[in-house]
Amino acid sequence: LSGGQKKKLVIAIALLGEPKILLLDEPFAALDLMTIKMLQEIIVNLQNESNISIILCDHQARDLLNCVDTAMVLSNCKIVANGTPSELVNNNKAKSAYFGNTFKIN
């Protein structure tokens, strides 16, 4: 099985138990861009068609922001920003958590 097929299989197995909450830890890790897009669509469809709360944890904001309603940015185990994807893209605290203080943030 490919990496994407394995991820889909794991999600399918998890859904067999009809969970109320689905926790996906780094679901996009080690996947190619096409497979990431496919998995994002699966996650969005699950959100729209089921009564499951989905929690995604990932280090790559670009992968998460395409398939979530709201997100939190953590730094040193503390929430530094939360909101919709469009709000977080423009949030200086979120940018600083990802890029550090090395870059000037306008």
What are these regions (language model features)?
Residues E18:
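Conserved catalytic motifs of ABC-family nucleotide-binding domains
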Residues L33-T35:
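Helix N-cap at the start of a conserved alpha-helix in ABC-type nucleotide-binding domains
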Residues K37-E49:
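Helical segment within the ABC ATPase nucleotide-binding domain
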Residues I11:
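Hydrophobic anchor residue at the start of the ABC signature
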